[in-house]
Amino acid sequence: MDLIAQIEAEQIAALGKDIPDFRAGDTVRVGFKVTEGTRTRVQNYEGVCIARNNGHGIAGSFTVRKISFGEGVERVFPLHSTNIESITVVRRGRVRRAKLYYLRSRRGKSARIAENTNYKPKSGASV
């Protein structure tokens, strides 16, 4: 393991976050800390993960898309952000692409993703 990867692994271990194994196509619920004035609360953001960027490293991020009041809303979350309180996998999707940007141009039933009922976690991955 080279020096940079070793430092990244130490930083990830120091954060002590338990990040579930999820990928593009999965419906996830992200508990994100929002500061309004002096108080802080947790806001849940639930939608389809359409992309994972930079893998599992310290710079990793993922994009979640949801439909809110008829408008598509996308939000990019840093994977190891201190503002993320929890990531929960609601539903496993069966897709054949790593990036689901084509969902941006789809509406209604054509934007649905089939559920993966035969999901098997990778060895050593937390569910």
Curated annotation (Swiss-Prot):
This is Large ribosomal subunit protein bL19. Keywords: Ribonucleoprotein, Ribosomal protein. It comes from Roseobacter denitrificans (strain ATCC 33942 / OCh 114). Belongs to the bacterial ribosomal protein bL19 family. One of its GO terms (cellular component) is cytosolic large ribosomal subunit. Signal peptide: none annotated. PROSITE patterns: RIBOSOMAL_L19. GO terms for molecular function: structural constituent of ribosome. HAMAP family: Ribosomal_bL19 (MF_00402). One of its GO terms (biological process) is translation. This protein is located at the 30S-50S ribosomal subunit interface and may play a role in the structure and function of the aminoacyl-tRNA binding site. It comes from the Bacteria.
